[in-house]
């Protein structure tokens, strides 16, 4: 197993994801760590790595809206709300949608909703397309440390053997904006 994900980085990353492990990859502003959203084992590994409580809920990042549909309930959206969301995607805006009862609690935490984003980062788009589904995505940093912005910073925080998809972040300074899909309420400024 090649932990450095050299050569065909996307195929190597998918191999790691299929082993229910966590990977790091560049996103719009910082490096993210992510895993298979359908694997409780993988999500628990990510939460342990980040020292993040399960009740906080997580974000899914996807190549397209279709990848997110199994995890969210968009039946209450009006045409105007859909237009607002789709005008911001793909891009650095995360929307919180109602979640159906079938969405695992290891993703939603204590909430009946799930934060999701359709990314515009080409490497993450390619990764999610090749994987065939979204990834759990949270900033690559250990508790109390700043988010990683380079491969070297990821290796400094998580160790030289941590699987990293090499690449550059999208250059944005701030993490994604987070808004409620139904009300438009701003939860986090981007």
From Swiss-Prot:
One of its GO terms (biological process) is tRNA threonylcarbamoyladenosine modification. Disulfide bonds: none annotated. It is found in: Cytoplasm. It is an enzyme of class 2 (transferase). It catalyses: L-threonine + hydrogencarbonate + ATP = L-threonylcarbamoyladenylate + diphosphate + H2O. It comes from the Bacteria. GO terms for molecular function: ATP binding; double-stranded RNA binding; L-threonylcarbamoyladenylate synthase; tRNA binding. One of its GO terms (cellular component) is cytoplasm. Its main location: cytoplasm. Pfam families: Sua5_yciO_yrdC (PF01300). Keywords: ATP-binding, Cytoplasm, Nucleotide-binding, Nucleotidyltransferase, Transferase, tRNA processing. Its EC number is 2.7.7.87. InterPro entries: DHBP_synth_RibB-like_a/b_dom, Sua5-like_dom, TC-AMP_synthase, TC-AMP_synthase_SUA5. Residues 7-190 form the YrdC-like domain. Required for the formation of a threonylcarbamoyl group on adenosine at position 37 (t(6)A37) in tRNAs that read codons beginning with adenine. Catalyzes the conversion of L-threonine, HCO(3)(-)/CO(2) and ATP to give threonylcarbamoyl-AMP (TC-AMP) as the acyladenylate intermediate, with the release of diphosphate. HAMAP family: TsaC. Belongs to the SUA5 family. TsaC subfamily. This is Threonylcarbamoyl-AMP synthase.
């Amino acid at each position: 197993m090649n932990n450095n994900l050299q050569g065909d980085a996307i195929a190597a990353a998918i191999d790691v994801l299929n082993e229910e492990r966590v990977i790091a990859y560049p996103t719009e502003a910082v490096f993210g760590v992510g895993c298979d959203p359908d694997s409780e084992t993988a999500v628990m590994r990510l939460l342990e790595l980040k020292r993040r409580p399960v009740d906080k809920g997580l974000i899914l990042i996807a190549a397209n809206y279709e990848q997110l549909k199994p995890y969210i309930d968009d039946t209450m959206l009006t045409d105007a709300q859909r237009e607002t969301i789709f005008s911001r995607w793909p891009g650095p805006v995360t929307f919180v949608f109602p979640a159906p009862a079938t969405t695992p609690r290891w993703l939603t935490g204590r909430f009946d909703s799930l934060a999701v984003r359709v990314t515009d980062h080409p490497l993450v788009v390619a990764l999610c397309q090749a994987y065939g589904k979204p990834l759990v995505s949270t900033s690559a940093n250990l508790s109390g440390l700043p988010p990683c912005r380079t491969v070297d910073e990821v290796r400094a925080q998580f160790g030289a053997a941590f699987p990293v998809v090499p690449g550059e972040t999208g250059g944005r300074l701030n993490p994604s904006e987070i808004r409620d899909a139904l009300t438009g309420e701003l939860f986090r400024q981007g």
